[in-house]
Amino acid sequence: MSTTPPNPYSFNTRNPNRANPFPQIQTAPPVSENKNITTFPFKTPLPKHYNPALNTPYFTDITKRILTDFYPKKCPTPECNSRILDKEISTRPDLIRCPQCRYLTSRLSYTPLHHFKLPIWMFGFVLYESIIQYPKVVTATELSKKLRIGYNAASLLKRRFQLFASDQLPKYKTLTFNALEDKFRDFLLPPNENKDITSKMRNKPYVCVDTAVLYSAGERASQGRKRYSHRGQTSSIYLSEKLGGKQIGTLVQTIAVKHGPVFFTSVPNQKAETLEPLIKEHLPTSTPLFTDQGYPWLWGVYRNHRSVNHSARSKDNRFRFARNRWSKNGVHNQVAEGNHRVLKTAFASYGYIRPEYSQLYLNEFSFIKNANVFGLDILVGEGGGSCLSRDAFSSNARATARGAVRIGGKGSLFEKYPHLLAENIML
């Protein structure tokens, strides 16, 4: 009786991300067919999601550190007096208990990792990769290939990281507001708007506000129909009224500080009643604010508001636009424009984002940018409040060794594990 030889190649055609990295050639009968074999080859039992190319203990410690610092668990027993749970279980990294009364609970419950089914080291991997790859974004497709998981699992993993970023981003907003309030407490620009303010703003951070459109809807998306009820940038994010007028694009409001943090907000329009509360929530009224001429109503709110005319005409008939239409008398909004270029280049990797999920992606990008500026230790009170100093947003903050705003802040979390950092083969 002839038997069909086993397939020499084992491929998973339904999900290539779960397949082996190289074709596995069958050179010997399987163990199930030869019970007496005691030498090689034999099947080695490997844990699920095993990946020898990644230093999983390193990323596990990062996840534990994040959960301990940002979501500490306290013992509910009255005798323990709300003691923080810090006793780990070697075989259960998702559990933690009290060293005194042995109270046991999950360290993932009521956190962004609530009911997390994947290994917890994957969350630390997403945080690590997002910080070191900035301004490039980490997509779900990239995670599915590197972690060898399905695309849906990678999408949910990225969504959990976006929830964590959205939860911690208000802390950066408070730090920025307090630093700007302390920096420009009694600051006043000259009342004459035509006077050059370059010397007045020297060694001071420029705060710029602007809007941009992501994934705009052209006439092809509207099946060749024009849009009569919308004008300006708003017209490029809505479909034609005959097609229902649904929003398919994203309008982003940007608040950026030079050499400092940036905050992106998804807005439906550019009306004053929509943008004014957002700006007042992020910036104190004494801040020198620089925009284009799309914000004429800001002069009644911010006394140090200045605008530049991007459509200024040239006095020379040989040219259409003036040379100073981008920067005039020290007034410009290039800080916001530069962040728009970084944002558009990064979000091109996603292809398209639905408007209802746009704020999560913007919060993630803002959090990674601000983590590169402030660091992560400042969020848990280990920075000593140095970000509130008057040099927090200085123009030479990157050059200072101990400045509160510094790119070097992104390494503060990983410096807690120098022994693991030396062993990480991915570096």
Describe each region flagged by the PLM.
Residues 2-427:
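Residue-level recognition of single "structural anchor" positions
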